[in-house]
Amino acid sequence: MLRKIYSIVALVCFSTFAFAQTGTLKGVISDLMTGEPIPFANVIIEKGGNQLAGTTTDFDGKYTIKPIEPGNYNVKATFVGYQTVEITGVIISANKITFQDLKLQEGVALGEIKIIEYKKPLLDQDNLSGETKTAEEIVALPTRSVSSVASTTAGIYQKDEGDAVNMRGSRENATSYYVDGIKVRGAIGVPTSGIEQITVVTGGLPAQYGDATGGIISVTTKGPSNKFFGGLEVESSSLFDKYNYNLVGFGLSGPILKKRNADGTKGSSIIGYFLSGEYRDVDDTDPSAIGRWKVKDDVLKDLQANPFRIAPNASAGFLSNSDFLTEDDFENVQAKLNTNEKRFNVSGKLDFKPTNTTFLSLGGTFYSRTSRDFSGWRSMFSSANNRESSQTTYRLFGKLTQKFGSQEESEDESSSATIKNAFFTIQGDYTNNKYTFVDADHEYDLFKYGYVGEFNTYKQNIYSGGTAVDSSTGIIYTGQIHSGWGDTLYTFDENQYTNVDLANYTRAYFQMFDDYGLSSFVGTENDGVIRTAADLRGQGLRNGDLPASVYSLYGNHGTMYNGSAKQENTQTTFKASGSADIKDHEFSFGFEFEQRDDSYWGMGPMGMWGLMRQLTNKHILQRDLANPKPVFDANGVYQDTVNYDRLFV
């Protein structure tokens, strides 16, 4: 009756495939001497001391085991009258078929097990366009970046260590990343010690990757072990270089609850866990082979205190002292300054296997990074103002796999079944990814960006010859008519707590303008008085201004990051899929629901000061021309002068 139900399900469901992060093991069991296939032989797979799945061969000695979580397994074949053979370390990759034949020898040392070490084939029969890297291979590589591991595959280009990859000429964003079947948004966030394998597909993409235009990088995390084990890793370069690379990693795995065997001993694990994590602190994440040039500390301190010098022609104003530095004022340093990165990521998984046909996995990853980002523009004079960025990603998932068919079926019944390897998988996941980009000192206090102090402008009326008409009386006045307002004094009250380096430009400019008795644009005397904002000539800085660059090559000292931004991306996914084998044909079906939510907020706060200067008093810039105010003396005699009040708009 059960088989009839399976048949109906298989016929009703169409082959619309949803993603399943599992692999398949196929092969033939045969006699070592004669080469004849062995029907009804038992084949099982084990990992970490747990028997995870098994089957029997058909009349042709063929077997198929699926679904199998990607990883390394021991494959064991047994049959009455033959020596047991076990192949260790067989690699099962996601969405691929691994072919493994076994040959049994009849009647030789039946009590012994022949153990053979698996050898990775040079050519993968089910994936000629890609490659799989195992945990052992990943650890042996001189990198901890998933993209860098993937770049060792033919057809993949990577510009530099840790950068995104280009697959067969496609753009970087055409590469899709998956972790345990979850499409990645944000950081991958899996510690190296928690990676079971990385599978790269560069061509011939399966149907479930319908939205991938470049290639696929699929990461499978490690699962629990039947025995407790743990590891600790510590790395540091602080004694040998200035990059100060420091890393601490750990991994823990083991059973929480085990089955009881008939004899009372503990059997395979029912509930198991795996937990891994890494913390990394490094001062320079991308060192230069030739070092970096920077201005010397004592020279920088002098520039901050004395940013200007008088021009040879004093009437030309001032020149920036940064433009007169020589080679002796610079030094080459091994590591970039103020580019520290702190990163923490942890990955965990709980596996439940109450029966041989039911499997539930719950897990997640957490990734957090805070860094000061390198800027070539600020590297020479103002690396202290490098941007601060942060990223936080967490990912949760749950997956249920239910196989059909009893493990207690007879060999004949199992091998002759029309429908085999029937199962369904239900998976749900949620991802949250957040970014921030700010100035480290001001963050979201927007009005502190570029603030150097308080400026006050003093004005007086400006007159010119002409006529004025009183609209209410029709009287026409001739004489000196009020035509506008002119600046008479421009003062600066320095802020001594925020952006001191920027404020020093303005303080020094006001002081030198007075010391050298320069003339204002709106003055006639060389009295050293600044009367209008135009007198600053782009050297004395107003709120929101940045200093002039050094030969258009580097930002001058005090150049700060002008940005404050937040970004959040979320993803919720639900998938269900099923599969069954009818003879040598596989029928698969499923669906996938994915919902994304993207939000971003950001601005260049220093630009607000320019807008505020344009908008301040905008409503009283005009004169009330309809209501002139003629000036009369005490005797009522017109003084040939007409004033206007401001017109409020």
Spell out what each predicted region is.
Residues Q83, V90-F99, E112-P206, I216, ...:
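Periplasmic N-terminal accessory/gating domains of Gram-negative outer-membrane beta-barrel systems
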Residues Y243-D373, E388-F404, A422:
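Transmembrane beta-barrel wall of Gram-negative outer-membrane proteins
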Residues M1-T22:
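Cleavable N-terminal targeting peptides that direct proteins into the secretory/outer-membrane pathway or into
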Residues E117, L232-S236, L275-D281, L362-F366, ...:
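Transmembrane beta-barrel strands of outer-membrane/channel proteins
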Residues F19-E112:
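Periplasm-facing N-terminal accessory domains of Gram-negative outer-membrane beta-barrel systems
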Residues V190-E233, D263:
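A beta-strand signature from Gram-negative outer-membrane beta-barrel systems
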Residues K62, F99, A164, T202, ...:
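Membrane-embedded beta-strand positions in outer-membrane beta-barrel channels/transporters
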